[in-house]
A protein has these predicted regions:
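Hydrophobic beta-strand positions that form the internal "hydrophobic ladder"
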Residues: 49, 105, 150-151, 198-199, ...
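Repeated scaffold domains used in trafficking and secretory/extracellular systems
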Residues: 35-39, 87-97, 134-143, 182-191, ...
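Asp-box/WD-like beta-propeller blade repeats and closely related beta-sheet repeat scaffolds
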Residues: 80-161, 174-184
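Blade/loop signatures of beta-propeller domains
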Residues: 1-23
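Blade-level signature of beta-propeller repeat domains, shared across WD40, Kelch, NHL, RCC1
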Residues: 328-380
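Blade-loop segments of beta-propeller domains
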Residues: 31-38, 60-106
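Loop/turn-rich, solvent-exposed surfaces of beta-rich toroidal or solenoidal domains
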Residues: 258-262, 272-312
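Conserved blade-ending motifs and adjacent loop-strand segments that build the rim/top face
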Residues: 238-239, 275-284, 312-335, 373
Length: 380
């Protein structure tokens, strides 16, 4: 492909309630999506933001990866591969992980991993892992380990077996983790795994409708060594959605209904409620572990920015997303390493697009000081 910068698609706006500056990064009338919120996809210097955009308007259309400056300028296409979406990708999007230094993007197409240069888009083949995947099976989900040596991939057919790829040698092998790799601790060579078989199905609701639910076993979080040994309990099933708290060994996430809180859990202690208030839905943490951003629902109270040391939070901005069942309507906010940029998605225009909110130091300090949106909005 010919890699050249595209014209900016940015639309700048100010949240009318909070005064926070928000930039719509993608505006072309095709679905766009940011990266999952469990791992940074903003370069450590806050220069570039990575996101996906669908190549054309069709149910199984492929997704390409772009980078853009944090101010919405210098839109640049990094990848263009395959003619259809990834069958076992994240809603059709190929799994991708940014390296610790933000210079390399590891992208999984099929069962083959490539390294993509974030500045130029040049691709390098890292490893083809077809020999570890049986017929009808596939690799999905990616977790980058402590010090960036290994990437763990889930086997779609198994809830216990992963593939571990050594980026130094290119050697890939099966490893029994006893669950699905959900994240890698960055303070020690351990992996957070979710044990239990998740089987998605539906159940009736009191109003005669149906809702999606897990018909399998309740998940439990453990940590294991990078070879699957030394299993340690983190916590039972308390989270609706969770991630590691940045580079720490703690886990943060939103409580299961009827809880309206963000939990913090770690090995050797009881989970604690960091804060309570609206129904926190999906939450991502800054790499330094100081900030958490969460969307809300039932009702939508906007994105909430939480200061971890104090547990104080305020409304950052309102996304205007539908927040309905389909994934495109979820804001799924993620936050930069230093907590100064928050990226989210909204289908407010009728087509899902990617946005960034710029968090001012004044706003951060107001949260630390315990300032509320309005006195009457205080949650008890």
């Amino acid at each position: 492909m010919l890699r050249t910068p595209f014209a900016s698609e940015r639309i700048s706006m100010t949240d009318p309630t909070t005064g926070i500056r928000v930039i719509q990064l993608s505006s072309y009338p095709l679905p766009a999506a940011h990266f999952p919120y469990y791992w940074p996809s903003i370069t450590p210097d806050n220069r570039w933001i990575l996101f996906y955009s669908q190549r054309f308007l069709q149910r199984n259309a492929p997704w390409d990866i772009f980078r853009v400056d944090a101010d919405g300028l210098n839109l640049f296409q990094l990848t263009e591969r395959n003619d259809v979406q990834e069958t076992h990708g994240y809603y059709g999007r190929q799994y991708a992980l940014l390296s610790h230094d933000g210079k390399t993007l590891y992208v999984l197409w099929g069962n083959t991993l490539y390294a993509v240069d974030v500045e130029t888009g040049n691709e390098e083949l890292i490893a083809c892992m077809d020999h570890l995947v049986g017929e009808g099976d596939a690799l999905s989900y990616c977790v980058l380990s402590y010090e960036g040596r290994y990437i763990f991939f889930r086997k779609v057919s198994s809830f216990v077996t992963s593939v571990r790829l050594d980026l130094r040698t290119g050697k890939a092998e099966d490893v029994e983790l006893g669950g699905i790799a959900m994240g890698a601790m960055q303070t020690e060579p351990r992996v957070m795994v979710q044990a239990g078989e998740i089987i998605w199905g539906s159940e009736p609701t009191p109003d005669g409708g149906r809702r999606i639910t897990n018909l399998g076993s309740k998940p439990v979080l453990y940590s294991v060594a990078e070879d699957g040994s030394d299993r340690r309990l983190i916590c039972p099933n308390i989270f609706a959605h969770c991630t590691l708290l940045g580079k720490t060994s703690k886990v943060q996430g939103c409580g299961l209904p009827p809880e309206r809180c963000i939990w913090i859990a770690e090995e050797g202690s009881e989970p604690r409620k960091l804060c309570s208030g609206p129904y926190f839905w999906h939450s991502g943490a800054s790499y330094d572990g100081e900030w958490i951003v969460a969307d809300t629902n039932w009702p939508d109270c906007g994105l909430q920015l939480v200061h971890v040391p104090t547990g104080h939070f305020r409304t950052l901005c309102h996304t205007g997303a539908t927040l309905e069942h389909y994934e495109f309507g979820h804001s799924h906010p993620l936050i930069s390493n230093d907590g100064r940029l928050v990226v989210f998605r909204s289908d407010r225009t009728g087509c899902p697009q990617v946005y960034v909110a710029h968090v001012t130091e004044e706003f951060r300090q107001s949260i630390i000081a315990g300032e509320l949106d309005r006195p009457k909005d205080k949650w008890i």
